[in-house]
Regions:
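Sec-dependent N-terminal signal peptides
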Residues: 4-14
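Sec/Tat signal peptide C-region and signal peptidase I cleavage site
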Residues: 15-19
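Short glycine/proline- and aromatic-enriched beta-strand/turn motifs that initiate or cap beta-hairpins
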Residues: 20-54
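Signature for the C-terminal beta-barrel architecture of outer-membrane proteins
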Residues: 21, 27, 31, 44, ...
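Surface-exposed loop and membrane-interface regions of Gram-negative outer-membrane beta-barrel proteins
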Residues: 62-93, 120
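Gram-negative (and chloroplast) outer-membrane scaffold detector with strong preference
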Residues: 89-104
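Outer-membrane beta-barrel "beta-signal"
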Residues: 94, 165, 430-451
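Conserved C-terminal beta-signal and adjacent last beta-strands/turns
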Residues: 369-372, 394-410, 443
């Protein structure tokens, strides 16, 4: 297992933490972070320079993320710019609007993106590695009577394409004025992965050529789905939607799900969200196939000497016994001081089917401290397996103190992934990577609106 230890003397940038909390500056405001430091990689000192400005104005937002790491000889670390997408990833994001706004467009890193009710794509992340950041595009537009959601995961290589179109058919009838039932929504979804490794189910690693040679390849993985949703409560106090989805993975199996999504704002200063879903899975079917770990799960070499590998397509092909399951999620935001969200899913009869996601943040604007944490784990076997760190885990923690309002002294720990490449520099998998960062950083907020 490769270990990467980082000590930053004066470093002024924040990590890629995939947090959903406080993602962007408020409209008319921005912040500039940047700095330089020393990084130890495999016992050798490397030198890091980083610039990360971010600004929001009206519905627009822009964030950049330039990170340069040089080895002791002054050469740029090759992992920093292996692919064309590495150059594009300097643009962390350009966006218009926010998710669930009438118009939402985002170009860049895609963190936790969901199509529809999430039974095909849920919390998908296109950049799970510091050394393999990607740039993609999402476009969601709601015209009132109809609309669509879409995603293109990466401009640097073939990847995931997804599109969900939906219509509110009763808006075209005399029932338009009837509360509740008039907002009935029907949707149709297509999502496919066109990456060259998406459909590999059998093969072997050639140690002479240092390349993986597939013997069975199903090609692209394509999923189509139909869904119906009904908002039974809609207002400032609460929003509650009932839904039913049916999905088919082409050349594999099918499944369905029914559930409820709710958001509550009863007192104004406490907000809560919840989701509960019952899943009915047929043979050769995986719900929420494109999840937050999909870029890791898609394909990876686990042992070059034996040629063993794992792929999601191989897992899909091997699921011969249907197994139903549950998914639950709960989130709370209290006074803007405490944010926490957690979710867990498991199949009824499959022992290693648990998937856990937790993230939390305590970062009051006026308080002298910062606490952040995020944790994801897949293929959980039992309760003892929940919090063991391995190649099925992602962890981010930050504990910080603010001696001044613009200065944070913190310790950051990341258990993430680094890409493994073959002789032709193609990514053939990922391996766990540890990053420890004692950090001093400065955040300079600014405003460009008139007083």
């Amino acid at each position: 297992m490769k270990k990467l230890y980082i000590l930053l003397t004066v470093i002024i940038f924040s990590s890629i933490s995939y947090s959903q909390f406080n993602q962007y500056p408020r409209p008319g405001q921005g912040q500039f972070t940047g700095g330089a430091g020393i990084t130890w990689i495999d016992g050798q000192p490397n030198y890091t320079i980083a610039l990360q400005p971010e600004v929001s104005f009206a519905n627009w937002g822009v964030g950049l993320d330039l990170r340069l790491t040089f080895d002791p000889q002054g050469n740029l670390r090759k992992e920093s710019f292996n692919d064309f997408s590495d150059y594009l990833s300097i643009i962390r994001y350009v966006r218009y609007g926010l998710k669930n706004d009438p118009v939402y467009i985002k170009l860049g890193a895609l963190d936790y993106y969901t199509l529809g009710h999430g039974t095909i794509m849920y919390r998908y992340n296109n950049s799970p590695s510091f050394d393999n950041r990607k740039i993609g595009l999402v476009t969601d537009i709601d015209f009132g009577d109809f609309g669509f959601e879409s995603i293109y995961s990466s401009f640097g290589e073939a990847g995931i394409v997804g599109l969900r179109g939906y219509v509110r058919p009763l808006h075209y009838t005399s029932w338009r004025a009837i509360p509740i039932i008039s907002n009935l929504e029907l949707g149709l979804t297509f999502a496919g992965d066109f990456n060259k490794n998406a459909g590999i189910t059998a093969g072997q690693y050639n140690n002479i050529t240092n390349k993986f040679e597939s013997t069975t390849d199903k090609g692209s993985i394509n999923i189509v789905g139909l869904d119906v949703g009904l908002p039974v409560i809609s207002g400032s106090f609460a929003d509650v939607t009932l839904y039913y989805d049916f999905n088919k993975i082409i050349d594999f199996g099918h499944g369905s799900a029914t559930g409820v999504i709710a958001q509550f704002n009863p007192l104004g200063f406490v907000q809560a969200s919840a989701k509960l879903e019952r899943r009915f899975n047929g043979d050769h079917y995986i719900p929420s196939y494109f999840n937050s770990f999909y870029e890791i799960e898609r394909f990876q070499i686990t042992d070059k000497t034996t040629g063993s590998f794992t792929s999601k397509a191989a897992l899909l092909a091997g699921l011969s016994n249907n197994d139903d399951g549950w998914y639950g999620e709960l989130g709370v935001n209290a006074l803007g001081l405490l944010n926490i969200i957690g979710s867990y899913q498991r199949l009824d009869k499959t022992p290693n089917s648990g998937i856990l996601h937790i993230e939390s943040e305590i970062a009051p604007e006026e308080a002298p401290f910062v606490l952040r944490a995020g944790y994801d784990k897949i293929n959980i076997r039992n309760e003892k397996d929940l919090f063991t760190l391995d190649d099925r885990s992602y962890l981010f923690t930050e504990v910080g103190y603010k001696p001044y309002p613009f200065m944070v002294v913190s310790l950051v720990y990341n258990w993430t992934f680094t890409p493994v490449r073959d002789a032709d520099d193609n990514i053939i998998g990922y391996e766990p990577q540890k990053r420890i960062e004692p950090r001093v950083y400065f955040v300079f907020p600014f405003s460009f609106e008139g007083s």
